[in-house]
Swiss-Prot record:
Component of the MRN complex, which plays a central role in double-strand break (DSB) repair, DNA recombination, maintenance of telomere integrity and meiosis. The MRN complex is involved in the repair of DNA double-strand breaks (DSBs) via homologous recombination (HR), an error-free mechanism which primarily occurs during S and G2 phases. The complex (1) mediates the end resection of damaged DNA, which generates proper single-stranded DNA, a key initial steps in HR, and is (2) required for the recruitment of other repair factors and efficient activation of ATM and ATR upon DNA damage. It comes from the Eukaryota. It comes from Mus musculus. This is DNA repair protein RAD50. The lineage of its organism: Eukaryota, Metazoa, Chordata, Craniata, Vertebrata. The keyword Kinase does not apply.
Length: 1312
């Protein structure tokens, strides 16, 4: 069941156009109440609901006045939008919004409806659909589960149309017809009647058409006979053509065999020439290989192979030893890297520790500086100079703590004093506010009471004014009542209702007899039609059997020769399918072999490309390695260059050591010669003869001592360069080995693999060509058989259908046995028409009499209603005159109360003004106290926080200093320096070991290079011997080919080939003549077939058969239509009566529980329907009226009831219609339901609505929407347990409507 959840309104009527003016209302279940004064916008909410659901605008507007007026908004364009969120009949959430645009154009406004959008949840995601208005209307009706007429007239009925149940007859009939959907069913009956007439005309047309179709069918049979004759002549001609073709086939096969042998001889001759060319090339290659070799090995093949294998073992052993050295070198390189890494880490750690030591000293200096600064700020003695001891620092902290406590106490005392003063001011303010609020509540309460009293006073005065002149009206009513009673008595006396009813009863009996007679005639007609259909079907089935026999014969003659040549016999469908399956299997196997070969070929091609790429890559790599070796060494002889470089390094190292020691020796010699006063040489002990000679030696030594550091530096620089170059050359040792491997092993192996792959590719191409030839032979055979399979399948289907036709012929023949057909269809039809004419006459008389009865009853009822209305009006005026004195006293009392309330409100307003002045003064004094308190507190807190921050910084530095000392960072620093020295010693020893291994590896590589040259010589000897063996094989093959050609008798085959070509040409000429005759027969057959394909002859027999079936079935359809018309008409009557009974029961219960008057017991809806039970030309009509019953008297309410009774009756009828027709939609909106109701009926209506809500409370989707201005009515509804909140609709300062949610308990305190 559908229900509405939420709606937003923007720019409609008095609702504002800005986003801030958008109003949103959520609908409660089971009851939503909207309260507000006139003009607040309550009815606009119902109009919006109706528009969003149906697309219809309120009465009296085409849309432009429905949108907020552009002139009021002072805008050129005003956009309005309504959004609704609801659940459809399936419980799924749906959102829809409609938009409108109103534009001000000169002196008029233009209105336009914009595209709407429907949004649904699908698979957890929102799916939006933009639609035109008509599509949205249909979708909304589908989602809500009720028709558009129920939405307009029952659920969302506008206030102006709320009394439609008591409108005039034509309008009331239209609305009830729409609600009951009677119009649609009446149109359906009209359509059935029109279809029946159309079908009757169609039967006549079919009879005329059958005559012409029979002539075309006979002419088509004649053309088919001619085609059969020509096809026989064509078959004979085709037999002659096939005989020529059979004679030609063996000659062609022999010719093909001879041509095959001749091509084989040519192929052998070409092979002999190719072998001679290959022999010459091989002899040339062997000669070139012998010239390239220094000498040829003279021993046996076995000796050569043994020598080659032994040589390979020696080379492999040396290579293994070289690999071991390489591994050892890599191990040492790894160890050196680890030591270098460890050395780097120790250096980093040493730097980090030194940085921490420097930072430790900085922290001590910063701490002492902060202590001096804070002591100066706080005026503490004894802390003018650092560094400070632990005792001084502890004393400093105690003094600072004492100072902080003293400052905090002073600030707290000041804050407490100011807070007390602020509290005093606040108490004074609260007292004045309470007095002001009391006066304000008094004014609000008395203003509300004043409003109610003024409203009651206006109501009382209005009623008094209406009572003027009531006495004269009573006299007029007495006269009218006497006249009405006299007319009623006369009408009852002249009535002939009983006589007419008796006549209607007699006519109905006669009508029943006629109906029975017509049913018997229908049964007889059906039996006659059934036998006629059987004979027609018998003829058509016999013709169908002949056609199928002919089709089977044609298919067999068409494919007999072809299938016999393929299988040896004419197969059935299963045999042909089995043969095709085996042939298809053979084709698939051939295709699989072909695909496998293609795959192998693609793989070989890919392998070839891979080898080519690898070979190119290896050659490029070899070139790169050689360039790299040349760039570093200047030649390809790495070992010699490396040896020379090592000798130079050793020489430079000795020179560096000598220069390093010379400095100390020269210094010692100079000291001995100068300080010790020795006159002899420190080396040779020769005595210097003179002082000048001594000074010359000393000067020479000092000169050498000065030059020694520069020479040492230059030597060390040169030594480092040579060592770097040596390291680079050592790094190229693996590159040199890679060059050797590429030249002697990897590149030759790749070239051998490439030759092998080329041979495999050529073999695969030959195999693929052979399989493709085989596939080209068997596939045409399969295609030919597949073409035949379709016709063979059709033939078997024709054979099955032929058996079915024969069975049906037997069945129809059995049906016609023993049938008496003396009475014709025309005789029965004539009798039926006579009976039908009499039935129509009787029916017309019944209807006429019923109309007379109804007219007399309505006249009498009208007079009774008029009499009752006059009595009721007279009684009402008398009652009102009795209440006049009471109402005058009430008017005086209300006027006195209104004046008293005005005085009291004025006095209270005068007392409020001095209180407001005192409140402003106290509020200003309080704010000044708060400002002083905040300023004083902030200054004290800033001073305390400053001291705390400085103490916190001192503590931070002290903690860092303590952590450094406790962690023992000084000892740890010394430990890391010792470890660094040890790693340097290990690194030096590792370097010496690496130099030794590099030297050994150089020697091994030189030995391996020498062995490789010997290995290449042995390989060339092996290759030469293998080529000599292949040359012997090539010399033998041409001899065998010449021997094979001698056995084929070439000359005799050429002569036979010429004779066969001459015989084949002769047979082909005769074959062409036979084909010409065959073409003539085929042209004649095509001409007849073309004539047979002309519109009048194409499918002439089938058209005749179909037209016969159409005519017979149309007659049967016409009869079914008449039966269906009657059944539908009776179903409409039954549905209408059931629904009216259900609606009247609900109306009766609601009226008795709601209406408090005694003049009307209950009300109900009366509907009168015309009796049409056959497919005649008349339509059924329903005439509706609302009547009120008092005892046995029923009077039309229209024109006889009061305004209050009219409102209550209309409301109850809508409630009943909603409960009956809104099974899928539990929504109902009531707009101002208490209009024109007195207090007693308002209370009973509230009680009835509460009972309805109570009975539907278990229905989760039931929603009642009540809009009213009567707060007493809302209060009555609020006493139930179903209302906690309601909405109040009012105008804001901009005169735009607002919707405010309120509690039901706030009703008594609201001020308008």
């Amino acid at each position: 069941m559908s229900r509405i959840e939420k709606m937003s309104i923007l720019g409609v009527r008095s609702f504002g156009i800005e986003d801030k003016d958008k109003q949103i209302i959520s609908f409660f279940s089971p009851l939503t109440i909207l309260v507000g004064p006139n003009g607040a916008g309550k009815t606009t909410i119902i109009e919006c609901l109706k528009y969003i659901c149906t697309g219809d605008f309120p009465p009296g507007t085409k849309g432009n006045t429905f949108v907020h007026d552009p002139k009021v908004a002072q805008e050129t364009d005003v956009r309005a939008q309504i959004r609704l969120q609801f659940r459809d009949v399936n419980g799924e959430m749906v959102a829809v919004h409609r938009s409108m645009l109103c534009s001000q154009k000169n002196k008029k406004t233009e209105f336009k409806t914009l595209e709407g959008v429907i949004t649904r949840m699908k698979h957890g995601e929102k799916v939006s659909l933009s639609s035109k208005c008509a599509e949205i209307d249909r979708e909304m009706i589908s989602c809500l589960g009720v028709s558009k007429s129920v939405l307009n007239n029952v659920i969302f009925c506008h206030q102006e149309d709320s009394n439609w149940p008591l409108s005039e007859g034509k309008a009331l009939k239209q609305k009830f017809d729409e609600i009951f959907s009677a119009t649609r069913y009446i149109k359906a009956l009209d359509t059935l009647r029109q279809v029946r007439q159309t079908q009757g005309q169609k039967v006549k047309e079919c009879q005329t058409e059958l005559k012409y179709l029979k002539q075309n069918k006979e002419k088509a049979c004649e053309i088919r006979d001619q085609i059969t004759s020509k096809e026989a002549q064509l078959a004979s001609s085709q037999e002659i053509v096939r005989s020529y073709e059979d004679e030609l086939e063996p000659l062609k096969n022999r010719l093909k065999e001879i041509e095959h042998n001749l091509s084989k001889i040519m192929k052998l001759d070409n092979e002999i020439k190719a072998l001679e060319s290959r022999k010459k090339q091989m002899e040339k290659d062997n000669s070139e290989l012998e010239q390239k070799m220094e000498k040829v090995f003279q021993g046996t093949d076995e000796q050569l192979n043994d020598l080659y294998h032994n040589h390979q073992r020696t080379v492999r052993e040396k290579e293994r030893r070289l690999v071991d050295c390489q591994r050892e070198l890599e191990k040492l390189n790894k160890e050196a890297r680890l030591l270098n890494q460890e050395k780097a880490e120790l250096l980093v750690e040493q730097g980090r520790l030194q940085l921490q030591a420097d930072r430790h000293q900085e922290h001590i200096r910063a701490r002492d500086s902060l202590i001096q600064s804070l002591a100066t700020h706080l005026e503490l003695d004894g802390f003018e100079r650092g560094p400070f001891s632990e005792r001084q620092i502890k004393n400093f902290h105690e003094l600072v703590k004492e100072r902080q406590e003293r400052e905090a106490k002073t600030a707290s005392q000041l804050l407490s004093d100011l807070t007390d003063k602020e509290a005093l001011k606040q108490r004074q303010l609260d007292e004045l506010r309470d007095r002001k609020s009391g006066l304000g509540r008094t004014i609000e309460l008395k203003t509300e009471i004043l409003t109610k009293k003024q409203s009651e006073l206006r109501h009382v005065r209005s009623e008094l004014q209406q009572l003027e002149g009531s006495s004269d009206r009573i006299l007029e009513l007495d006269q009218e009542l006497t006249k009405a009673e006299r007319e009623l008595s006369k009408a009852e006396k002249n009535s002939s209702i009983e006589t007419l009813k008796a006549e209607v009863m007699s006519l109905q009996n006669e009508k029943a007899d006629l109906d029975r007679s017509l049913r018997k005639l229908d049964q007889e007609m059906e039996q006659l039609n059934h036998h006629t259909t059987t004979r027609t079907q018998m003829e058509m089935l016999t013709k169908d059997k002949t056609d199928k026999d002919e089709q089977i014969r044609k298919i067999k003659s068409r494919h007999s020769d072809e299938l016999t040549s393929l299988l040896g016999y004419f197969p059935n469908k299963k045999q042909l399918e089995d043969w095709l399956h085996s042939k298809s299997k053979e084709i698939n196997q051939t295709r699989d072999r072909l695909a496998k070969l293609n795959k192998e070929l693609a793989s070989a091609e890919q392998n070839k490309n891979h080898i080519n790429n690898e070979l190119k890559k290896k050659e490029e790599q070899l070139s790169s390695y050689e360039d790299k070796l040349f760039d570093v060494c200047g030649s390809q002889d790495l070992e010699s260059d490396l040896g020379r470089l090592k000798e130079e390094i050793e020489k430079s190292s000795k020179q560096r050591a000598m220069l390093a020691g010379a400095t100390a020796v020269y210094s010692q010699f100079i000291t001995q010669l100068t300080d010790e006063n020795q006159s002899c040489c420190p080396v040779c002990q020769r005595v210097f003869q003179t002082e000048a000679e001594l000074q010359e030696v000393i000067s020479d030594l000092q000169s050498k001592l000065r030059l020694a550091p520069d020479k040492l530096k230059s030597t060390e620089s040169e030594l480092k360069k040579k060592e770097r170059r040596r390291d680079e050359m050592l790094g190229l040792v693996p590159v040199r080995q890679s060059i050797i491997d590429l030249k002697e092993k990897e590149i030759p192996e790749l070239r051998n693999r490439l030759q092998s792959v080329n041979r495999d590719i050529q073999r695969l191409k030959n195999d693929i060509e052979e399989q493709e030839t085989l596939l080209g032979t068997i596939m045409p055979e399969e295609e030919s058989a597949k073409v035949c399979l379709t016709d063979v399948t059709i033939m078997e289907r024709f054979q099955m259908e032929l058996k079915d036709v024969e069975r049906k012929i037997a069945q129809q023949a059995a049906k016609l046995q023993g049938v008496d057909l003396d009475r014709t269809v025309q005789q029965v039809n004539q009798e039926k028409q006579e009976k039908q004419h009499r039935l129509d006459t009787v029916t017309s008389k019944i209807e006429l009499n019923r109309k007379l009865i109804q007219d007399q009853q309505e006249q009498i009822q009208h007079l009774k209603s008029k009499t009752n209305e006059l009595k009721s009006e007279k009684l009402q005026i008398a009652t009102n005159l009795q209440r006049r004195q009471q109402m005058e006293e009430q008017s005086v009392e209300l006027s006195t109360e209104v004046q008293s309330l005005n005085r009291e409100i004025k006095d209270a307003k005068e007392q409020i003004s001095p209180l407001e002045t005192a409140l402003e003064k106290l509020q200003q004094e309080k704010e000044e106290l708060i400002h002083r308190k905040h300023t004083s507190n902030k200054m004290a807190q800033d001073k305390i926080n400053d001291i705390k921050e400085k103490v916190k910084n001192i503590h931070g530095y002290m903690k860092d200093i303590e952590n450094y000392i406790q962690d023992g960072k000084d000892d740890y620093k010394k430990q890391k320096e010792t470890e660094l020295n040890g790693v340097a010693v290990q690194l030096n020893e590792c370097e010496k070991h690496r130099e030794k291994i590099n030297k050994d590896m150089g020697t091994m590589r030189q030995d391996i290079d020498t062995q490789k040259i010997q290995e290449r010589w042995l390989q060339d000897n092996l290759t030469l011997r293998k080529r000599r063996d292949e040359l012997k094989e090539v010399e033998e093959e041409p001899k065998q080919h010449l021997k094979e050609m001698g056995q084929m008798q070439v000359l005799q085959m050429k002569n036979e080939h010429q004779k066969l070509e001459e015989n084949i040409d002769t047979i082909k000429r005769n074959h062409s003549l036979a084909l010409g005759r065959q073409k003539g027969y085929e042209d004649e057959i095509l001409h007849f077939k073309k004539e047979l394909r002309e519109p009048q002859f194409r499918d002439a027999e089938e058209k005749y058969r179909e037209m016969m079936i159409v005519m017979r079935t149309t007659e049967l359809v016409n009869k079914d239509l008449d039966i269906y018309y009657k059944t539908l008409d009776q179903a409409i009557m039954k549905f209408h009566s059931m629904k009216m009974e259900e609606i009247n029961k609900i109306i009766r219960d609601l009226w008795r529980s709601t209406y408090r008057g005694q003049d009307i017991e209950y009300i109900e809806i009366r509907s009168d329907a015309d009796e049409n039970v056959s497919a005649s030309d008349k339509r059924r009509n329903y005439n509706y009226r609302v009547v009120m019953l008092k005892g046995d008297t029923a009077l039309d309410m229209r024109g006889r009831c009061s305004a209050g009774q009219k409102v209550l009756a209309s409301l109850i009828i809508r409630l009943a219609l909603a409960e009956t027709f809104c099974l899928n939609c539990g929504i109902l909106a009531l707009d101002e339901p208490t209009t024109n109701l007195d207090r007693e009926n308002i209370e009973s209506l509230a009680h009835a609505l509460v009972e309805i809500i109570k009975s539907r409370s278990q229905q989760r989707n039931f929603q009642l929407l009540v809009i009213t201005h009567d707060e007493d009515f809302v209060e009555l509804l609020g006493r139930s347990e179903y209302v906690e909140k309601f909405y109040r609709v009012k105008k804001n300062m901009d005169q735009c409507s607002e919707i405010v949610k309120c509690s039901i308990s706030s009703l008594g305190s609201y001020v308008h």
